[in-house]
Amino acid sequence: MTLEAIRYSTGKLVIIDQLQLPYVEKYIEVPTSKDAWHAIKKMRVRGAPAIAIVAALALASELHTLMAHDKLSNRAEEVRLFIQEKLDYLVSSRPTAVNLSDAARKLAAHVSDHAEMPNSTGRAVAEAFIQAAEEMLAKDLKDNTNIGKYGAEWIIRNALAGGRSKATILTHCNTGSLATSGYGTALGVIRALASKNALAYAYCTETRPYNQGSRLTAYELVHENLPATLVTDSMVAALLAKAEAAVDAIVVGADRVAANGDTANKIGTYALAVLAKFHGVKFLVAAPLTTIDRSTKSGADIVIEERPASEVTTIKGAVETESSCDRIKLETVRIAAEGIHVWNPAFDVTPSALIDAIITERGVVERGTDGRYNFDGIFEDHSAF
């Protein structure tokens, strides 16, 4: 059974607290945009698609509560301004992930259209927002399934060597059910391969310093009983050089893809792409169209979020003794010398020249004969939500 990171019914949003994983599966309510901002900032929820959905649904829940208690203005323009203010606030929680700003822009335009309608009311504007946010949730799940399908098909056609019928895949960070509405992007490709009986093995990186790979991706792989092994980030070169490992492709997600294909993703992705190029391993990015930002010309224009030094100098985990592992008692311990300076960018940018293909819900985009990515065709008739 696939994990549920997001549980939603109209007026109530609940998310799994990813800071407690993999030790405790605890769900917390996110009733307001303020709660969503803190959940995103503290990384109780993470993954570009997931944070956009949580932000939208938290504001939808807040609007529903205000209407239920008759605390929402009946003036359409006042409600529109209220929504815009909340969306701007939510976007500030994680600036690198384009899905959040893209969703905010589309939702703001949607409610503006409704606010400008003749005889529009505050309730009508709020209800339009709620409906659009709920549609985002459903669409993301459908899109992820398609990403998995197209990615698996591409790998079977292009990445398998020696007549083999099953692929060995390495992935980075967490891009599964915990990072999306469900199924996942890069991890969704692994799921799709498994569903086709075309997955030989999966490797996931630890993903320092926040350990999303060891805490979350490994948790999902174990939860679904998929054949997998955890490696530290620094072991990947040795793994790719190991003939018996026979890694066919590295598949990663993305927080922002620029118009030229340069991709911002979890720190360490760039290094994986360089290693893949050297070892002749296919390097693929799996991301929905909402992650592709055609207004950003190249990776040089992407703002990279920097995280607190404590994420590098300390580590949190369950207390383990020789006889047992206490899954409830979590402790934070220091692992670096006090006084050392820390640089902790959350993301890096992989140049498009190192990326073999970008997998979307509309299909797989490869570089053209000029060696460049062009997304124009795949964006034709792309709807707002």
Curated annotation (Swiss-Prot):
Its main location: cytoplasm. It is found in: Cytoplasm; Nucleus. The active site is at 255 (proton donor). GO terms for molecular function: S-methyl-5-thioribose-1-phosphate isomerase activity. Its EC number is 5.3.1.23. Pathway: Amino-acid biosynthesis; L-methionine biosynthesis via salvage pathway; L-methionine from S-methyl-5-thio-alpha-D-ribose 1-phosphate: step 1/6. It catalyses: 5-(methylsulfanyl)-alpha-D-ribose 1-phosphate = 5-(methylsulfanyl)-D-ribulose 1-phosphate. GO terms for cellular component: cytoplasm; nucleus. Keywords: Amino-acid biosynthesis, Cytoplasm, Isomerase, Methionine biosynthesis, Nucleus. InterPro entries: IF-2B-related, IF-M1Pi, IF_2B-like_C, Initiation_fac_2B_a/b/d, M1Pi_N, NagB/RpiA_transferase-like. The record marks 173 as: Transition state stabilizer. GO terms for biological process: L-methionine salvage from methylthioadenosine. Catalyzes the interconversion of methylthioribose-1-phosphate (MTR-1-P) into methylthioribulose-1-phosphate (MTRu-1-P). HAMAP family: Salvage_MtnA (MF_01678). PANTHER family: METHYLTHIORIBOSE-1-PHOSPHATE ISOMERASE. Belongs to the eIF-2B alpha/beta/delta subunits family. MtnA subfamily. This is Methylthioribose-1-phosphate isomerase. It comes from Aspergillus clavatus (strain ATCC 1007 / CBS 513.65 / DSM 816 / NCTC 3887 / NRRL 1 / QM 1276 / 107).
